[in-house]
Amino acid sequence: MKKSTIQIGLLFTLCLVSIGCQSHSVQMTSGKKYLSGYTSHGSTDANASDLNEEVKAMASIEPSIQFPARIGLVKLFNGRITNLTVDEVEAWEESRAVMGSQFGDFIPVSPMVAEMVYTPKSTHGKSKTSPSDIFRKVRLGAARQHLDHVLIYEVFSETKTTKLASSVANWTIIGGYFVPSREIKTTGFANALLLDVRNGYPYGTASATLNAKEFSASQTYRDKSRNLADKNLVSTVIKLIPEVQKMMKKLMEESKQA
């Protein structure tokens, strides 16, 4: 009930919300079984041979997920680990309660812990952090907190502002502050990936999008645009959580059969 209240409250803070989309998938396939069908073509090309060995190395991992589990939560924004909002923490906790004690716990991975244990491979100060470096940092931070698996979710948005016919009011001092002359549209995106901390096995993915729009006067549309995008991002995460929940339930069922 509390989760529904959080979600409804967030959505109503957005003036107009349209439905986006949601999806999820799970993986529990065996690396050993996958490689049993792997045949060598006897290529004399050194580059092809190296690639074949790399493919084998990437495939040779096994699923080992068991419940209850300690599952870390990592939120990525602008390529960095960031703190969860209060609304997100409450929503994740509600999801954990719905799945019951047989699920385990969601535990946020501390950005400070991740930074403490991570050492960049490159010593160049201006080198850009690559996606592989980010995943490495996440797994190291989660390992230091003794977590079994880690759910990484990244959020970002696209925002567009359009002038309306009423923008003629911008020619007046008062009208520029009070007459709605801009339409702000924003789309929030949230993508999640569940990884095994120990071997990097990808157990599942989930995604969600959410559209929102608002009208604003010309003198205030920049602030309103930022505020709308921020609120919509949190609402997009709230919309992502049910998909993660479905993914987790499937994994709980499949882990019992493994």
At which residue positions do the language-model features occur?
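Hydrophobic helical h-region of N-terminal Sec-dependent signal peptides
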Residues: L10-C15
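Bacterial N-terminal signal peptides that target proteins for export
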Residues: M1-G9
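C-terminal/domain-edge helix-coil "capping" segments
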Residues: Q22, V26-I65, S157-K160, P180-A258
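A general structural signal for short secondary-structure junctions and capping/turn motifs
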Residues: K2, E62-S64, G141-A143
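C-terminal motif of bacterial Sec signal peptides marking the signal peptidase cleavage site
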Residues: V17-G20
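N-terminal segment of the mature soluble domain
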Residues: F67-K160
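N-terminal post-signal-peptidase region of extra-cytosolic proteins
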Residues: D50-A59, P131-R139, A169-V179
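Short helix-loop boundary/capping segments
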Residues: L164-V168
